[in-house]
Amino acid sequence: MSSGKVLQVIGPVVDVEFPLDEKLPEINDALKIKESDGKTLTTEVALELGDGVVRTIAMDGTDGLQRGMEVENTGASISVPVGDDTLGRVFNVLGEPVDNGPKFGPDAKRMPIHRDAPKYDDLNNATEILETGIKVIDLLAPYVRGGKIGLFGGAGVGKTVLIQELIHNIAQGHNGISVFTGVGERTREGNDMYYEMKASGVLEKTAMVYGQMNEPPGARMRVALTGLTIAEYFRDVKGQDVLLFIDNIFRFTQAGSEVSALLGRIPSAVGYQPTLATEMGQLQERITSTKKGSITSIQAVYVPADDYTDPAPATTFAHLDATTNLERRLTQIGIYPAVDPLASTSTALTPEIVGKEHYEVATQVQHVLQRYHELQDIISILGMDELSDEEKTIVARARRIQNFLSQSFSVASQFTGLPGKYVPLKETIKGFKEILAGKYDDLPEEAFRLVGPIEDVVEKAKKMKAETDEDSSED
């Protein structure tokens, strides 16, 4: 392969000059620079400047680089390890292990991170629901197999626990694999996530890729592609259903904006890169269902200053099939998962896709909860006595529904002391249908909280009654 020399270094941007009689590296090719301390720095070609000079973006710090250092053209884009050996491991953007585990040798299976989206002929055009076993999601904001879901929520509302439960349920219910990609978030959070997943027993079915906020923009921009490439192997070669978590998709855009400015491109709206829609599309179009398997992506979305018209979240929304909104108000009254049943949405919630019964039950649940929401002001000011009998019934059922939307999680059982429950979709629909019909109006509201299927509610109510009878007989 051809070799050149470092011409200039401007932060994470490295210009490299190649002899005019040698073949220039192509855009997205990886270059290797041997540093004086023996380490190798990888850069990626971003621009050709002419006269044998290319402008590259470094995937690590450029401290210690000097003009004239030798640069080797690898003749290919960055490639990362794939396959079963990646499970339970933590990687950086280059696919190098960062968990103090064994390194991957030259014989390890690898795939380039820059790949085309699947061809139209290879896509699975049937819309299938991906059952998660989590009642509130399956009923009100169902996930599509091969779809993209936006996860919204502030700090401490249970995003991580929900992500872990999804990983657990996909592994148990679908024998699926998960890939967690940390893009531009805090190193401490990545570290905590690793140990929490280890403790909850889901790590061996998960590959983790991190490009944290202290890393150069090149690494943060490409780390999502590294995680996606690992997921694509399990979909295309192993024929599996894969969950791909990206936390946070906004940081992917932010890193692209930094790189764009470093390359001297004229910024677009609000200072973002002019190639924003293209970069987002190249990533999102690779996340899909094929005839072999599927990649379903759950992406945490940070909304700058809560402005949903900002180009970064607005470009992301164009690709989403569903949104799962976590609400702090629900955590304060002990409803976990704290998914807002009225704010969460899904394009799949139509009778043609989920079926007539599911659609009708879901819309009735939303109607009852919306009516309860409207009546809360009256209740807080005037009290329950001012409501009509019909309104009192709606409030009573809405409270039971709200409690029944909560659920005990397997990954949280060590903290709650309650066994986790995977609830099949049929059971979920049956339970809510019977609550709406008034079948359980006589059971206490508390019996509906943090349980699995409706049978658990009946069982819990019996226990509560037995305990009450026991206490009264002792008195």
Swiss-Prot record:
User: Where is it located?
Assistant: Cell membrane
Q: Which GO terms describe its cellular component?
A: plasma membrane; proton-transporting ATP synthase complex
Cross-referenced SMART domains: AAA
InterPro entries in the cross-refs: AAA+_ATPase, ATP-synt_VA_C, ATP_synth_F1_bsu, ATPase_a/bsu_AS, ATPase_alpha/beta_chains, ATPase_F1/V1/A1_a/bsu_N, ATPase_F1/V1/A1_a/bsu_N_sf, ATPase_F1/V1/A1_a/bsu_nucl-bd
Q: What is its EC number?
A: 7.1.2.2
CDD domains per the record?
A: ATP-synt_F1_beta_C (cd18110), ATP-synt_F1_beta_N (cd18115), F1-ATPase_beta_CD (cd01133)
Catalyzed reactions: ATP + H2O + 4 H(+)(in) = ADP + phosphate + 5 H(+)(out)
Question: Which molecular-function annotation in GO is an example for this chain?
Answer: ATP hydrolysis activity
Tell me how this protein sits in the membrane. Peripheral membrane protein
- Cited Pfam families: ATP-synt_ab, ATP-synt_ab_N, ATP-synt_VA_C
Tell me the SUPFAM superfamilies matching this sequence: C-terminal domain of alpha and beta subunits of F1 ATP synthase (SSF47917), N-terminal domain of alpha and beta subunits of F1 ATP synthase (SSF50615), P-loop containing nucleoside triphosphate hydrolases (SSF52540)
- Does Metal-binding appear among the keywords? no
Residues binding ATP: 153-160
EC supergroup of this enzyme: translocase
The entry describes its oligomerization and partners as:
F-type ATPases have 2 components, CF(1) - the catalytic core - and CF(0) - the membrane proton channel. CF(1) has five subunits: alpha(3), beta(3), gamma(1), delta(1), epsilon(1). CF(0) has three main subunits: a(1), b(2) and c(9-12). The alpha and beta chains form an alternating ring which encloses part of the gamma chain. CF(1) is attached to CF(0) by a central stalk formed by the gamma and epsilon chains, while a peripheral stalk is formed by the delta and b chains.
Q: What does this protein do?
A: Produces ATP from ADP in the presence of a proton gradient across the membrane. The catalytic sites are hosted primarily by the beta subunits.
The UniProt similarity line reads: Belongs to the ATPase alpha/beta chains family.
| HAMAP family reported for this sequence | ATP_synth_beta_bact (MF_01347)
**Name of the molecule in the record:** ATP synthase subunit beta
Which species expresses this protein natively?
Answer: Limosilactobacillus reuteri (strain DSM 20016)
Taxonomy of the source species: Bacteria, Bacillati, Bacillota, Bacilli, Lactobacillales
